[in-house]
Amino acid sequence: MIRILDTDFNLQAEIEPIYMEWTRRYYRGDSFTFKVPLNTYITSLNYVIFDNRVGVITKIVSYKDYLQVSGKEYGFSVNKRIVSPSTQTGAAETLQKYYVTANCITPTARKILNLSVESDQGRGTSTTLPARYQDLEELLVEIYQRTGLGWCIEYLSGMFIFTTIEGKDRTSTQNINPRAIFAEEYGNLEEVVVTDSINSYFNVVYMGGQGTGAGRTVEEVGTGTQNNRYELFADAKNLSTTTQIQDKGNEILNEYRETYQLAGTFRSTDSITYETDFFLGDIVTVKHDDYMLDLRLVEVKQIIDTKVTYEFTFGKEPNTINNALNKRLSLINSEVRI
């Protein structure tokens, strides 16, 4: 059952979809799609409430017998925010909440209605993050890639709360938390698909430092040679020392490593249940063929059809065309003169 609200948050209808997918991600906003009867009254920008998640309808397609509705999570996934220039140093959680507050809450004209930020607990490793006109959601993805800290927006009593997620280590080799182990032979993982990709792999980056034209400082970071060399350019005008440029270059190359992912359909068993024994963002152990892999659960797609199923993605952020483009744009962003 989903609830439909108008743009003033008034309840319009409660609907049982013919079919629905709701995808939660550890590193960026949710997305959803569902089908309803053709005579259902529904419009773009209506809000959709499912469990404690709220989405905004951004697209409606009419077919012969039904409407297909899709959208994204309420907040800056829909109402995009571009980050004002700033360089901050601190714990990953502190940086997340600073940039959300500075670009979505404090400025009156840019405020996203009813959005608040939970109290800062200072979780995650410390890092220095220069920001300059990036998409806010992509900046939060960068924080995740550097520190492993995720986020979500929860709906509680009419308020949307930006919340930090810190996944737990539930791998087979640790003894602190209950373990979560997945394998086809255990009956809790089916239809496994493994992806090993170098589509977005680079091992050398040219860091454009201060100066202009022929006088601009350019530092080369990385050691690839000949046919094992994959080059990239990134802007670093806001960095002043060679050490800072080298460190930033290494961070960028870390984001463009070979991508390994494993996806499959989860089946609950007597010994393991989603959101009871493990959660989105946890690092778990996946057994596949002769390998035992420790991977983070980064994406959960809940499918409601004749039954409820879950499709899991373990590993890094998926390398979609949009994600790759957003990464490239963020690297050259400060080249644009405004």
Give the ranges of each region predicted by the language model.
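Oligomerization/assembly interface segments of phage tail-like spikes and tubes
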Residues: 24-37, 65-77, 207, 256-270, ...
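Short, surface-exposed secondary-structure edge patches
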Residues: 35-41, 273-277
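Short beta-strand-centered aromatic/proline hotspots
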Residues: 54-61, 293-302
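Short beta-strand-centered interaction patches in the first periplasmic/extracellular domains
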Residues: 61-78, 113-202
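Surface-exposed cap/loop segments at beta↔alpha junctions
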Residues: 37-118
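Amphipathic, non-transmembrane alpha-helical segments in extracytoplasmic/periplasmic proteins
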Residues: 8, 15, 34, 71, ...
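Acidic, small/polar-enriched beta strand-loop surface segments
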Residues: 141, 170-258, 262-296, 305-308, ...
